[in-house]
Amino acid sequence: MMILGNLRVATLSDGYGLIPDAAILIEGGRIQWVGPEAHLPPSAAPRHDMGGRLCTPALIDCHTHAVFAGTRAAEFEMRLKGASYAEVAAAGGGIVSTVTATRAASADELLAASLPRIDAMLAGGVGTVEIKSGYGLDIETELRMLRVARRIGELRKVRVRTSFLGAHAVPPDYRGRPDAYLAEVVLPALKVAQDEGLVDAVDGFCEGIAFSPAQIAHLFAQAHKLRLPVKLHAEQLSNLGGAALAARHDALSADHLEYLDAEGVAALAAAGTVAVLLPGAFYALRETQAPPVAALRAAGVPMAVATDLNPGTSPLGALGLAMNMACTLFRLTPEEALAGTTIHAARALGLSDTGRIAPGFRADLAIWEAEHPAELSWRIGPAPLHARLHEGEFV
């Protein structure tokens, strides 16, 4: 048991939910009480004076591809010199290069490559991170990626949620045969992953260059049979009705959404599905059509913000910078950006015990060298993190 005193607490209970001169009572890894310190119930718990600093829930990065091998720096240079997508692919670049490197990496090598990325996230105030598979595209490597993700959660003071993304792309050995790939690789791998307790949700990529709505619907039906929630990469490059499809399947989230239309917005609102905005990919791909934030806001769709950390289209590992990008590029307010990396990000992962500072919630907290929550989205550069607590313990 302990008390954090002399804080400015953003509870995220109503907007920022800001409480000046606040205290938090923590016991058993959970928040027992929060409010003005003058009203703190009598307690013999040791008190830590936090010097008037800002306290928020630890941040949640709800969409990452943080486990992979290799880099895509060479094709980054190629694109800047004018190479087309086809030319990059012909030179061995694109997702195939990451798949090749990831398949060749052992579990230990994948872990060694991934831990520094996770450590950088934690230094930015992240306390929960989602990690997807999707760079194996064969049964063995997809499972290896998920095992490495679980191992990260054991080695670091971070809560890891895994998403099975076997339906990320059709590998070269199944080119032109996506249905066979789903039947022979994706669904068998999913069953093994579920049997081993490796998967928390099932994801897919609904796009002309990936999988059709009918194929995703089949995948989701199988996921539901395994009692697994679903989420979807949707409307990133075109509109195939992926968001509405996700909503029909009670998806936790639909992610990207640059080409989301009014029908999709209405479907997300009706289903309570979270819209996950990924400004890093929008920036890296130099897209020009942004997600319809005003329409999502008007419809009451909860909006989350994540890094989409991946080697090809969003090599962004700083959630604070993603918050700034969401405000600058997508016109979110700083309040929306903070909610998008706390309470709404938790909802996008199906978590109901984190993302707010309230009695009964996990004591996953971030203490910042800041006076006001808007500073977290305003800053560009190193995160002003002073300290982080994971289940009520300083880390």
Swiss-Prot record:
UniProt catalytic activity: 4-imidazolone-5-propanoate + H2O = N-formimidoyl-L-glutamate
Molecular-function annotations in GO: imidazolonepropionase activity; iron ion binding; zinc ion binding
Amino-acid positions noted as binding 4-imidazolone-5-propanoate in the UniProt annotation, renumbered to this chain: 72, 135, 168, 236, 313
EC assignment: 3.5.2.7
Binding site for Zn(2+): 63, 65, 233, 308
Record-stated family: Belongs to the metallo-dependent hydrolases superfamily. HutI family.
PANTHER family according to UniProt: IMIDAZOLONEPROPIONASE, IMIDAZOLONEPROPIONASE-RELATED
Protein name, as recorded: Imidazolonepropionase
UniProt source species: Cereibacter sphaeroides (strain ATCC 17029 / ATH 2.4.9) (Rhodobacter sphaeroides)
